[in-house]
């Protein structure tokens, strides 16, 4: 894998939330810090970490640290955007505390994986290539987010 800029890593940290498995109307639920979390992750078993399956049909598994490094409370706002490939995405702005948490977490985990968990499912687990702080981009797979997925994410984050 080639080296990415901090912006690309943020995109890749992609909070790649394909919400196809979420029920319609999920955006109507109250904002809950447990809905979206970022965790340290590993392809290998780690004592006291839990194994989780990826949301998609791949059936892949990853080990995640039980305690989240960041959650919805660390996100200040979100707006529709485009990723570096022009796909539908969501631009996140972290709170001051969230930006500091992300900077510290990503700095300490360069070269390691971070799992993006939404409603108890692993959405993505990119490798952190450099420190990330105040902004990140949510994108998804090869085609980006659908309009419905983007709306749901915006509704949840901006509550």
Residue ranges of each PLM-predicted region?
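Structural signature of multi-pass, alpha-helical inner-membrane proteins
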Residues: 2-4, 22-159
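Sec-dependent bacterial lipoprotein signal peptides
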Residues: 1-20
């Amino acid at each position: 894998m080639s080296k990415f800029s901090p912006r690309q890593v943020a995109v890749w940290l992609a909070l790649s939330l394909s919400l196809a498995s979420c029920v319609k109307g999920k955006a109507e639920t109250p904002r809950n810090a447990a809905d979206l979390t970022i965790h340290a992750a590993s392809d290998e078993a780690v004592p006291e970490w839990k194994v989780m399956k990826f949301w998609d049909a791949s059936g892949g598994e990853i080990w995640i640290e039980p305690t989240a490094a960041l959650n919805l409370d660390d996100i200040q706002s979100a707006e529709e955007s485009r990723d570096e490939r022009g796909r539908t995405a969501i631009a996140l702005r972290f709170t001051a505390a969230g930006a500091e948490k992300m900077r510290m977490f990503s700095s300490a985990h360069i070269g390691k994986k971070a799992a993006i968990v939404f409603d108890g499912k692993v959405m993505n687990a990119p490798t952190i290539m450099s420190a990330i702080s105040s902004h990140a981009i949510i994108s998804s797979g090869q085609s980006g987010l659908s309009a419905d997925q983007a709306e749901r994410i915006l509704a949840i984050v901006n509550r």
